[in-house]
A protein has these predicted regions:
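N-terminal module-boundary/linker segments of secreted carbohydrate-active enzymes
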Residues: 24-85, 98
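N-terminal Sec-pathway targeting helices
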Residues: 1-15
């Protein structure tokens, strides 16, 4: 009788534990930054994975140092109010938007430009507009001039110009700072709408398999945020890379394997 009682107690504890774990997963999947991480670099890698330095170690560390808003922060529209589909957001980045035109491609250019500006590489801040003309920044260390440059850039650049300007990268060679981008329109009229997301961190296991974090903005303009991976059973933000995949579903957006780009 005592043995049966012990078994029942053990089973009851297991059920309670499983229910608690399930509740933790459910709550975590609906709450932004559930563990209150301070920066992107604080987000733990998947088990068995280690962060890579990347070809530009300073750029990798800059992206990992980007601050996150606290637990439960909503993705807010630039014009005010909560954006739709909050569950797509894993953590909100603590970077105020500069204008209502700062959308997906603009966010990718913004993060790249912020790195160059904050490290004093002013002469390397240059992007092309939709007509292929290079727009170079020449305001030096002036934050006001830098932000004015970006606001002007947002009005004349897009996923189309970004995809043409950046160079292709093989998935197996993915680096922090790379961008998945498909253009809103190309010469053949493909894609009514475009989208771009930035790889803000990359980790690798001993077998060379990569995992990565993505950040995005969207239309209408909203807070930059780390994306949640709904295919991950733990609702983790880490995406896993299949080098042989022809099509990648990143959150709700599909990308072809040849749509990974780098600056």
């Amino acid at each position: 009788m005592k043995t049966i009682k012990k078994i029942l107690i053990v089973l009851l504890l297991m059920v309670i534990s499983m229910l608690g774990y399930g509740a933790w997963i459910l709550i975590g999947s609906k709450t932004s930054n559930p563990n209150n991480y301070k920066t992107i670099g604080d987000i733990p890698t998947p088990w068995g994975y280690e962060r890579i330095k990347g070809d530009d170690a300073a750029y990798s560390e800059f992206l990992r140092s980007l601050a996150l808003k606290g637990r439960g922060a909503d993705v807010m529209l630039y014009t005010g109010g909560r954006s739709r589909f909050q569950s797509l957001n894993y953590a909100v980045m603590d970077i105020p938007l500069l204008s209502n035109a700062e959308q997906c491609a603009d966010v990718c250019m913004r993060l790249r430009a912020e790195y160059l500006f904050q490290t004093g590489q002013y002469g390397r801040i240059r992007f092309k507009n939709v007509n292929g003309k290079t727009l170079a920044y020449n305001g030096g260390s002036s934050r006001k001039a830098f932000e004015r440059y970006l606001r002007n850039l947002y009005g004349v650049a897009s996923t189309f110009s970004l995809s043409r300007e950046m160079k292709t990268r093989r998935l197996a060679e993915m680096q922090p700072g790379d961008v998945f981008v498909y253009a809103a329109a190309d010469r053949h009229g493909n894609h009514k709408y475009g989208h771009a997301v930035m790889v803000v961190d990359v980790a690798e296991n001993k077998s060379g398999k990569k995992s990565f974090l993505l950040a995005e903005g969207n239309t209408p303009a909203r807070d930059i945020h780390v994306m949640r991976n709904f295919e991950n059973p733990f609702r983790s933000p880490w995406f896993f890379l299949d080098d042989d995949a022809d099509l990648l579903l990143l959150s709700v957006f599909p990308y072809k394997s040849n749509e990974l780009r780098h600056f």
